């Protein structure tokens, strides 16, 4: 259950459903993507990950799944969420394509007015193959870093440290 804007719960608790903060939703979307990405990297081959939110916002749901499927194409796939009376995911949001028709049928979306519950979203991913894991450290190791080993620079650093750090 990823941190989310909680927009789906507003309907359940009769809160103001007209207020939506796009910046907040985009911030959550970025965080959710990073969390799910870390989960994909940490999951063993043939392992499954269940992703869920209590929001109706496609930026926090289908878009996150779309980005993961795109980044890890061929190594991760959607599995069918087998829940009765679920609604399919969204294939498009405004002018942005999200999920294919096949993938939209695999995820579960729950609408307050249809399922008489708070709004939420569920997707199930399966990892099909191992992935290369790179860190910022790995990227830096590949780049040549030229060090200035001149006595003058060393002397300047030493003097600065003595004066400012004791």
Predicted regions and their residues:
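S-adenosylmethionine
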Residues: 1-166
């Amino acid at each position: 259950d990823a941190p989310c804007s909680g927009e789906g719960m507003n309907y359940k608790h009769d809160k103001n459903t007209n207020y939506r903060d796009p910046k907040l939703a985009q911030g959550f979307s970025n965080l959710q993507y990073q969390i799910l990405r870390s989960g994909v990297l940490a999951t063993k081959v043939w392992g499954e990950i269940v992703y869920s939110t209590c929001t109706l916002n496609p930026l926090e749901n289908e878009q996150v799944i779309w980005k993961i499927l795109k980044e890890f194409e061929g190594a991760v796939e959607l599995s069918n969420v087998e829940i009765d009376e679920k609604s399919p995911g969204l294939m498009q949001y405004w002018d942005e394509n999200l999920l294919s028709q096949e993938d939209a049928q695999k995820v579960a979306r729950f609408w307050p007015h249809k399922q008489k519950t708070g709004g939420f979203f569920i997707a199930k991913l399966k990892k099909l193959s191992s992935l290369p894991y790179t860190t910022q450290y790995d990227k830096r190791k590949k780049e040549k870093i030229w060090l200035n080993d001149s006595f003058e620079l060393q002397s300047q650093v030493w003097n600065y440290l003595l004066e400012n750090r004791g």
